[in-house]
Amino acid sequence: MSGEEEENAAELKIGDEFLKAKCLMNCEVSLILEHKFEQLQQISEDPMNQVSQVFEKSLQYVKRFSRYKNPDAVRQVREILSRHQLTEFELCVLGNLCPETVEEAVAMVPSLKTKGRAHDDEAIEKMLNDLSLVKRFE
């Protein structure tokens, strides 16, 4: 990203390093950290000695703000959002915040309505309905 152009997440001007990065939703990070914590419990008599304060706080945060807890639901959410040609950034914002209406989704991720993209209101509504089904049956 050139020094002249300001970063703006609403327009997906977030820098090349972020556009190319693989993003994880809170629920995905939660699964990874929980798995690591379980591994530490198995190899240590006192697993809390093996866990840093940063690890513990990070795990608490992602558990608290994860909208999906079941590993199958987490997989389904990523699959649903991936079908809609979203960037990783958009996918994670929608997966973390779980908007319920098209208006909420566009307010949270204005780039959904960028010219030339195939995200009309009906497509966004279908995506949100699919996500709500996953949440309902989790």
Curated annotation (Swiss-Prot):
Residues annotated with N-acetylserine modification: 2
Cellular component terms (Gene Ontology): RNA polymerase II, core complex
Alphabetized InterPro entries for the sequence: HRDC-like_sf (IPR010997), RNA_pol_Rpb4/RPC9_core (IPR006590), Rpb4-like (IPR045222), Rpb4/RPC9 (IPR005574), Rpb4/RPC9_sf (IPR038324)
Location relative to the cell: Nucleus
One Pfam family here: RNA_pol_Rpb4
GO molecular function: DNA-directed RNA polymerase activity; nucleotide binding
Keywords from the named record: Acetylation, DNA-directed RNA polymerase, Nucleus, Transcription
Gene Ontology terms: biological process: DNA-templated transcription initiation; transcription by RNA polymerase II
Role summary: DNA-dependent RNA polymerase catalyzes the transcription of DNA into RNA using the four ribonucleoside triphosphates as substrates. Second largest component of RNA polymerase II which synthesizes mRNA precursors and many functional non-coding RNAs. Proposed to contribute to the polymerase catalytic activity and forms the polymerase active center together with the largest subunit. Pol II is the central component of the basal RNA polymerase II transcription machinery. It is composed of mobile elements that move relative to each other.
Subunit structure: Component of the RNA polymerase II complex consisting of at least 12 subunits. Interacts with NRPB7.
Family in the record: Belongs to the eukaryotic RPB4 RNA polymerase subunit family.
Record-given protein name: DNA-directed RNA polymerase II subunit 4
Protein species of origin: Arabidopsis thaliana
